């Protein structure tokens, strides 16, 4: 790297720092219908299966992964 590299990089990023960043206008309304108990149970169960089942599989087979590697 040359001596001028930091100066060139500072020149490139300096102009980007002065640009205004537009803020998003996000508005939300109350839900039209409340969720029922069954819908909540299905949602929580699907999240549980999606995230915790693969992690549990990996943790339960960790010894076999260690022996293989």
From Swiss-Prot:
It is a single-pass membrane protein. Pfam families: COX8. Residues 26-36 are mitochondrial matrix. Coiled coil: none annotated. Residues 61-69 are mitochondrial intermembrane. Its main location: mitochondrion. Pathway: Energy metabolism; oxidative phosphorylation. One of its GO terms (cellular component) is mitochondrial inner membrane. The chain crosses the membrane at residues 37-60. Disulfide bonds: none annotated. InterPro entries: Cyt_c_oxidase_su8, Cyt_c_oxidase_su8_sf. The keyword Transit peptide applies. Gene3D superfamilies: Cytochrome c oxidase, subunit 8. It is found in: Mitochondrion inner membrane. One of its GO terms (biological process) is mitochondrial electron transport, cytochrome c to oxygen. Residues 1-25 form a transit peptide. In response to mitochondrial stress, the precursor protein is ubiquitinated by the SIFI complex in the cytoplasm before mitochondrial import, leading to its degradation. Within the SIFI complex, UBR4 initiates ubiquitin chain that are further elongated or branched by KCMF1. Keywords: Membrane, Mitochondrion, Mitochondrion inner membrane, Transit peptide, Transmembrane, Transmembrane helix, Ubl conjugation. A motif (SIFI-degron) lies at residues 2-19. Component of the cytochrome c oxidase (complex IV, CIV), a multisubunit enzyme composed of 14 subunits. The complex is composed of a catalytic core of 3 subunits MT-CO1, MT-CO2 and MT-CO3, encoded in the mitochondrial DNA, and 11 supernumerary subunits COX4I, COX5A, COX5B, COX6A, COX6B, COX6C, COX7A, COX7B, COX7C, COX8 and NDUFA4, which are encoded in the nuclear genome. PANTHER family: CYTOCHROME C OXIDASE POLYPEPTIDE VIII, CYTOCHROME C OXIDASE SUBUNIT 8A, MITOCHONDRIAL. Component of the cytochrome c oxidase, the last enzyme in the mitochondrial electron transport chain which drives oxidative phosphorylation. The respiratory chain contains 3 multisubunit complexes succinate dehydrogenase (complex II, CII), ubiquinol-cytochrome c oxidoreductase (cytochrome b-c1 complex, complex III, CIII) and cytochrome c oxidase (complex IV, CIV), that cooperate to transfer electrons derived from NADH and succinate to molecular oxygen, creating an electrochemical gradient over the inner membrane that drives transmembrane transport and the ATP synthase. Belongs to the cytochrome c oxidase VIII family. This is Cytochrome c oxidase subunit 8A, mitochondrial. It comes from Saimiri sciureus.
């Amino acid at each position: 790297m040359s001596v001028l590299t930091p100066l060139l990089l500072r020149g490139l990023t300096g102009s980007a720092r002065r640009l205004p960043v537009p803020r998003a206008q996000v508005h939300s309304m109350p839900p039209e219908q409340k969720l029922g108990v069954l819908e909540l149970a299905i949602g929580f169960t699907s999240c549980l299966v999606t995230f915790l089942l693969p992690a549990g599989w990996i943790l339960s087979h960790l010894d076999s992964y260690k022996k293989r590697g």
